[in-house]
Amino acid sequence: MDKNTILGLLLMGVVIFGFSMLNSGDDQSNQPTTEKTEKADAKQATTDIADSLNANELARIKTIVRQYGKQDGDKMVLTNDNVSFTVASDSLTGSVMMDGNMTVALSDLQHAPSADNRLLYNAAMKKVRDAAENVAKYSDFVQFVGGGNKTVKLENELLTLDLSSKGGQIAKATLKKYTAFQHGKDGNCVLFDSKHNSYGFAINTDTHRFDTKEFNFTPVQENDSTVLMKLDFGKGVYFGIRYTLPKNSYLVRMEVVQQNMAAVISSNVSTMDFEWNQKMMRHEKGQTFEERNSGVFYKFSGDDVENLSETSNDEDKTNNHLKWVAFKYQFFSCVLIADQHFIGAAPMKSAVIDKNSEEHNDFLKDVSFNSSLEYNVNNPKPAAFNFFLGPNEYKLLSSFDDKISPDEDLELTRLIPLGWSMFRWINTCIIIPIFNFLGTMNLNYGIIILLLTIFIKLVLFPLTYKSFSSQAKMRVLAPDIKEINDKYPGNENAMKRQQKMMELYNRAGANPMSGCLPMILQLPVYVAMFSFLPSCIELRGESFLWASDLSAPDMILEWDANIPVINWIFGHHLSLFCLLMTGVNIIYTYLNMQANPSNNQMPGMKWMMYLMPVMFLVFFNDYGAGLSYYYFISLLITIAQTYAFRFIIKEDKVRAKMAENAKKPRKKSGFMARLEAAQKRQEAMLREQQKRKK
């Protein structure tokens, strides 16, 4: 054989040997797998074989039925979550209702099932044992665990409530006269729903905790406006929560009621816990201000209103008595007002929804409140509340003081951000009454803001006129002021220059401060309006010209793209009223600079004055259209007043009058005399210092 043949035979041998080893490896690797599978199948088969109820379990169930079951003739019956037990004489019977309306008798669970029924019996066995555990956990309340949820409605002209039998609570609250921008579209304003709101009362004994959120109540329609969610123990023993919704009201009466509960609850129980959790839903198109103006508010009994941070995660714990607690939105609130008070509180919490999460577009915050209430098992009404579910309207909230608490100011109007003390006083005593009066005329709210602006301008007219008169005098004196500045230049002549200025003002009867003071006195009104309009629910959803909602930005230009710097400054839109306000503000600044030439002589003042309107554009771009519209109208009226004053106040007449005043001997005013004396003392000190240096 040649070398090629030998090489071919060797290669064939290698291939055959390789395949043999490969097949041998597969057989060996498969063997453990097969053994594991067989063992797993055996284990599964063992697990799938249901054991039976033993004598101890049956005896325990029999004792439970006798202790917690309901009397039915000569039998005791106990039902829990589709499991029914019956004790008659000394025998125990029962059944388990399975899916598909299949029933398994309790007697069938007392011996091992056949292989065909083991899955069904396993499920039935689990239900029986869970029922026994529920009884151990809930004792007399076990009959109210499980079962299907039922919903009943309470409704009036303003509010629709869905009451859930699960927990006996308000599952959903819908405001009928308001719409909300939720899940990308407009619809009825739902304050909360069952998935994102829950509350309940809990009674703690030495051995058990009974939480109403875990029980299924029976709805009892007492009349058109009242529903009692009831846990009926039989024999005249019951516990319930009664809800009453009066006509044309946002105020829900919620009362905890009971009868003969001493048969179930020990008399040494003196407190009842209350827990309320809510994931606050978005309602507005303008996300920025909705986030800034939502959170947890609360009032101490006989004391002030406080709140958790509205812009960051926060929590607080107090041992003081609380009168009410509110989960407050920008324009709506859920307020629970206790007839008596809450006894302190576990940490109240507010957590801002992460901006990077999917929930951020639909929700604002996760909030919670935990507290306690006084409880007496023999009191037929151990706790009662007024539950406000409605708009943050000043007139409405202020009316509850007389309706609910005539002896104590509830201060619910503090839910509306109207500014600090002085600005709040201007809003509550002047702005809001006039605004409400104009609102009775059924005018468009854009017109109402215009009329309110005109009224404010009329009230401030004397101050504005005084300011412009002073500016006219300063314009007339501008050449003389320039002459003094040129004659006494430099810091070394500062005192002399200032003295000559004061002499000039005194001769002419002018005061450089008289123009500033009227403007300063007008400032609180502008700040008050800055607080009032963004919180005014009357503007919500009201259209005017191109603005579809005066409480939200009137976005004339929007974009989704991420534009560096631009997005950081403006967000993703530009508001037209804000742009108009900025343009008018620049015009007003120009006119004001022309009217006060002295400002142009100050380094950097000119550019500073023109920069301010641009800063306002950035600042107000996210605000509601109503506020920008107000400032736009106010500036237009101010410009009109400026031209009117220039027509009325002739500078020639002002100059002639000042010349006439200069001829008269004038007594120095107290301010001018003190200022001149101070200047002379400073000059003397300066001369003394110069002598010492020499």
Question: What are the residue ranges of the model-derived segments?
Answer:
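Helix-loop-helix
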Residues: 1-43, 48, 163, 256-257, ...
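Soluble non-transmembrane domains of integral membrane proteins
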Residues: 51-411
